[in-house]
Amino acid sequence: MKVAVSGFKGRMGHEVVKTVLREEDLELVAVLDHEPKEKNIREIVEFSSLDVPVYANLSEMLEEAKPDCVVDFTTPKVGYSNTKTILEHGVRAVVGTTGFTPEQIESLREIAETKKIGALIAPNFAVGAVLMMQFAQKAAKYFPNVEIIELHHDNKLDAPSGTAVKTAEMMAENRTFVKQGAEDEVELMEGARGAEYEGMRIHSVRLPGLVAHQEVIFGAEGQGLTIRHDSYDRISFMSGVALSIRKTKELETLIYGLENILD
């Protein structure tokens, strides 16, 4: 299966390139960077034995390299337009870029179904993170008082994280609405109580040294429950990325969330 990587110079994109090279059934045919200094990936010491073209223009890459699937790890600013372009060219997409609105996801789903091609957008590709979200969804039925703390490296551009938003969405489906906190609480500093989704509070931490971490903290009379997942290295996401690439061959629609393709 021919694969191209968009955003290959980012930390996640770089790890995806190495993953595609390791997998026997996947072939790296192109990489994309918005301002490349190289014309071929072999100009990078780590990949000096390879012959893979570097593109600056997405449409040009799609037309010349003809990948079966594009993996996109870029930025929220261009994530939607990139995915739209990929699908409109009739190419499958695996997208780890976050920041999509529900309306954008539905628009992309319509394109995928019209073209009859598979695509997957996932806030998190770590299987452990998906299990955390599923456990939290189940717990929310019995513990409606809950807050989320998500922690990421300080270069992450969006807050709260896509994983935190997805977790809140899943819990809301299974949770009696409770507006967390005192009715007359006052923020002495704006934003002190975090963002709010369906009465739940979401707090974002950005610090150097972190990768991707999340706690879902439940409280009830006389007891508490904390569900936590930690990604210490970006390799934790790669099994999910490889699975998603292969899964797009079986799909004729866009799937949102890795949990929807796990058995």
Curated annotation (Swiss-Prot):
It is an enzyme of class 1 (oxidoreductase). Gene3D superfamilies: Dihydrodipicolinate Reductase, domain 2, NAD(P)-binding Rossmann-like Domain. Its EC number is 1.17.1.8. Pathway: Amino-acid biosynthesis; L-lysine biosynthesis via DAP pathway; (S)-tetrahydrodipicolinate from L-aspartate: step 4/4. It catalyses: (S)-2,3,4,5-tetrahydrodipicolinate + NAD(+) + H2O = (2S,4S)-4-hydroxy-2,3,4,5-tetrahydrodipicolinate + NADH + H(+); (S)-2,3,4,5-tetrahydrodipicolinate + NADP(+) + H2O = (2S,4S)-4-hydroxy-2,3,4,5-tetrahydrodipicolinate + NADPH + H(+). It holds the Pfam family DapB_C. One of its GO terms (biological process) is lysine biosynthetic process via diaminopimelate. NAD(+) binds at residues 7-12, 96-98, 122-125. (S)-2,3,4,5-tetrahydrodipicolinate binds at residues 153, 162-163. The active site is at 152 (proton donor/acceptor), 156 (proton donor). InterPro entries: DapB_C, DapB_N, DapB_N_CS, DHDPR_bac, NAD(P)-bd_dom_sf. GO terms for molecular function: 4-hydroxy-tetrahydrodipicolinate reductase; NAD binding; NADP binding; oxidoreductase activity, acting on CH or CH2 groups, NAD or NADP as acceptor. Keywords: Amino-acid biosynthesis, Cytoplasm, Diaminopimelate biosynthesis, Lysine biosynthesis, NAD, NADP, Oxidoreductase. It is found in: Cytoplasm. It comes from the Bacteria. Its main location: cytoplasm. Catalyzes the conversion of 4-hydroxy-tetrahydrodipicolinate (HTPA) to tetrahydrodipicolinate. This is 4-hydroxy-tetrahydrodipicolinate reductase. The lineage of its organism: Bacteria, Bacillati, Bacillota, Bacilli, Bacillales.
